[in-house]
Design a protein with these regions (language model features):
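Conserved catalytic core of nucleotide polymerization and phosphodiester-bond processing enzymes
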Residues: 1-165
Length: 165
C-alpha cells in the first residue's frame, strides 16, 4: 500500500474482490493518516518539480505525471510514491556495499564481497574470519546512513548460499 498499489492490484495479490481491497486501503490510510499525507505530498512535489528525490538527493524524472493519459499518469503517481522510498534504500545499500568492500581490503582479509541483492550483501568468508567479517558488516551497514531510526542488520551463515538464507 505504501508503494501506491491500486485496489485492482491489491485484489489480485490477495485474491479478494476489488471492493474489499478498496476498503482495506481506505482503512489502512484511516489508521495511518500521516502516511497518506506523506505519499500525497510526494506526488504533489513530483508534479510540481517534474521529479522526485531520494534522501541523498538522487533525482528520478517522472514525465508521466503530466500525461493526459490516465494510465500513464497513474503509473507516474506510483513511481512518485515508490522511488523516494526504494531509491533511498538502494542508495543506502550501495554506500554500505562500498564501506564493507573497503574495510575488507583495509583489514587485509581473504573474505570477498560476492553479491548484492536488494538489501542483502553476500560475502564468501573463511571460517577463521567469520567473527571480524560479522563485526565489519554490522558496523559498516549500520553506519551507511544516519536516520532517526537505527538500521537493523541480520546475518546468516552457511556452507552454501542456500544454507545461509
Amino acid at each position: 500500500i505504501v508503494y501506491g498499489i491500486s485496489s485492482f492490484g491489491l485484489s489480485q495479490d490477495l485474491s479478494i474482490t476489488r471492493k474489499e481491497a478498496a476498503e482495506y486501503i481506505e482503512n489502512y490510510f484511516e489508521t495511518y493518516p500521516k502516511i497518506k499525507g506523506f505519499l500525497d505530498g510526494l506526488v504533489a512535489d513530483g508534479k510540481e518539480k517534474g521529479y522526485v528525490s531520494t534522501m541523498l538527493g538522487r533525482r528520478r524524472p517522472i514525465p508521466e505525471l503530466k500525461s493526459g493519459n490516465f494510465m500513464q499518469r497513474s503509473f507516474g503517481e506510483r513511481v512518485a510514491m515508490n522511488s523516494p522510498i526504494q531509491g533511498t534504500a538502494a542508495d543506502i545499500i550501495k554506500i554500505a556495499m562500498n564501506r564493507v568492500y573497503q574495510r575488507l581490503k583495509q583489514e587485509g582479509l581473504q573474505s570477498r564481497l560476492v553479491l548484492q541483492v536488494h538489501d542483502e550483501l553476500l560475502i564468501e568468508t573463511k571460517k577463521e574470519e567469520l567473527e571480524i567479517v560479522s563485526r565489519i558488516l554490522e558496523e559498516e551497514m549500520k553506519g551507511a546512513a544516519h536516520l532517526s531510526v537505527e538500521l537493523d542488520v541480520d546475518m546468516h551463515e552457511g556452507n552454501s548460499w542456500y544454507e545461509a538464507k
